[in-house]
C-alpha cells in the first residue's frame, strides 16, 4: 500500500480496465452456454430461467427485486420440477443425496507442502490476479459512481492474506469473483456489510453436507440460465466504464487494443511456457496492458493556426 496505486493507473487506464472487465464476462460466457447445450430441453429451460430473472427484475419492487437472482432461481427450479418430476419431459430432480447427507460435518483439512517448481509455476498468476482484481474494482467503481482508488491497496492485501490462509489449510488460491459483480449490478446492493454477512453464512454452511447436497440438486440448465444473465452483466459493466470515463474509441490505438483484448478473452486464447499456461483472461489482461503501452500516444494540444489578414 505504501508504493501507491498510481503505477497501476498508468498501466491500466479506463480504456484498458473496461476492456479487461468486458473480456472477463465474454470469457465466462461459453461456460454458461455449454452447460445448457446438452439437449433441446436444457436450452429451453435456460431460456425460461432468463425470463424468470428478467420478469422479477422488471415487474417487482423492494426486497424481492433485490433478491431477483435467488427468486428467479427458485421459480425456475419449481418450473423445472413440474416439467420433469411431474410431466416427465426431462431428467428428474433426485433428492436422494439430500436425504442421506448429514446435517453437520467437518471439511477435509490438510497441511501445506512446499515445492519449489510448483511455486515458480504458480507465482506469475499473482500478477494476473492483481490486474484482474483491479478490473473488478474498476467495474464496481463504474457501477457505484464512487472512487475506489483509495481502497486498492486494501483489496490487494486482503486478497493475498486470504490466499495465504486458504493455502495453510490445504485450500486453493482465492481471488475476487467476477460473478459477484454481476449480482451487484442486478440487485443494486453495494454494501460491504452484505458481503461480510454472506461470507460468514457461506463458511457456516460449509460445515453442513446436507446444504451442499441441496445445492447439487439445482438443475444445470437453471444454473446455466442464471449464469447467462450474470456473465452478460459483467461484460456490460466494462462498457459502462468506457461510457462514464468518456473513452474515445475513435482513436485507432484504443480501437485496436479493445478489439484484440475482447477476442483474446472471448476466444480463451492461451499461451504455454514450459509447464505454465496463461488462460484467456490472463492473455487478455496482459495483451491490453502491452497494446495500450505500445499504441497509446499522448494528445498534444496544437494551437489553432493564426489568421493573417491581408490588406486589400
Residues covered by each model-derived region:
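Intrinsically disordered, low-complexity non-transmembrane regions of multi-pass membrane transporters
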Residues: 89-108, 142-145, 155, 294-312
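Membrane-embedded alpha-helical modules
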Residues: 1-86, 197, 204-305
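Alpha-helical transmembrane segments of integral membrane proteins, especially early/N-terminal helices
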Residues: 76-97, 188
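Membrane-interfacial loop-to-helix junctions in multi-pass transporters
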Residues: 14, 43-44, 111-119, 148-155, ...
Amino acid at each position: 500500500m505504501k508504493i501507491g496505486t498510481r503505477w497501476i493507473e498508468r498501466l491500466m487506464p479506463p480504456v484498458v480496465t473496461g476492456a479487461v472487465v468486458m473480456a472477463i464476462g465474454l470469457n465466462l460466457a461459453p461456460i454458461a452456454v455449454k452447460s445448457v447445450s446438452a439437449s433441446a430441453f436444457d436450452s429451453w429451460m435456460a431460456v425460461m430461467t432468463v425470463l424468470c430473472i428478467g420478469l422479477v427484475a422488471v415487474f417487482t419492487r423492494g426486497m424481492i427485486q433485490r433478491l431477483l437472482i435467488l427468486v428467479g432461481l427458485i421459480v425456475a427450479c419449481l418450473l423445472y420440477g413440474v416439467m420433469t418430476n411431474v410431466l416427465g419431459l426431462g431428467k428428474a430432480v433426485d433428492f436422494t443425496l439430500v436425504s442421506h447427507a448429514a446435517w453437520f460435518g467437518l471439511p477435509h483439512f490438510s497441511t501445506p507442502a512446499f515445492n519449489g517448481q510448483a511455486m515458480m509455476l504458480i507465482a506469475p498468476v499473482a500478477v494476473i490476479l492483481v490486474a484482474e482484481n483491479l478490473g473488478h474494482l474498476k467495474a464496481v467503481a463504474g457501477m457505484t459512481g464512487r472512487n475506489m482508488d483509495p481502497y486498492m491497496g486494501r483489496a490487494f492485501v486482503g486478497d493475498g492474506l486470504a490466499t495465504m490462509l486458504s493455502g495453510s489449510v490445504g485450500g486453493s488460491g482465492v481471488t475476487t469473483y467476477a460473478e459477484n459483480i454481476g449480482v451487484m449490478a442486478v440487485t443494486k446492493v453495494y454494501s460491504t456489510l452484505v458481503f461480510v454477512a454472506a461470507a460468514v453464512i457461506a463458511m457456516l454452511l460449509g460445515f453442513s453436507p446436507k446444504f451442499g447436497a441441496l445445492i447439487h440438486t439445482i438443475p444445470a440448465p437453471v444454473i446455466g440460465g442464471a449464469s447467462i444473465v450474470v456473465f452478460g452483466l459483467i461484460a456490460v459493466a466494462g462498457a459502462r466504464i468506457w461510457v462514464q470515463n468518456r473513452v474515445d474509441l475513435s482513436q485507432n490505438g484504443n480501437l485496436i487494443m479493445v478489439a484484440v483484448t475482447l477476442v483474446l478473452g472471448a476466444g480463451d486464447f492461451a499461451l504455454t511456457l514450459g509447464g505454465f499456461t496463461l488462460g484467456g483472461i490472463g492473455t487478455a489482461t496482459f495483451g491490453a496492458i502491452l497494446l495500450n503501452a505500445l499504441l497509446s500516444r499522448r494528445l498534444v494540444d496544437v494551437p489553432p493556426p493564426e489568421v493573417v489578414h491581408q490588406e486589400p
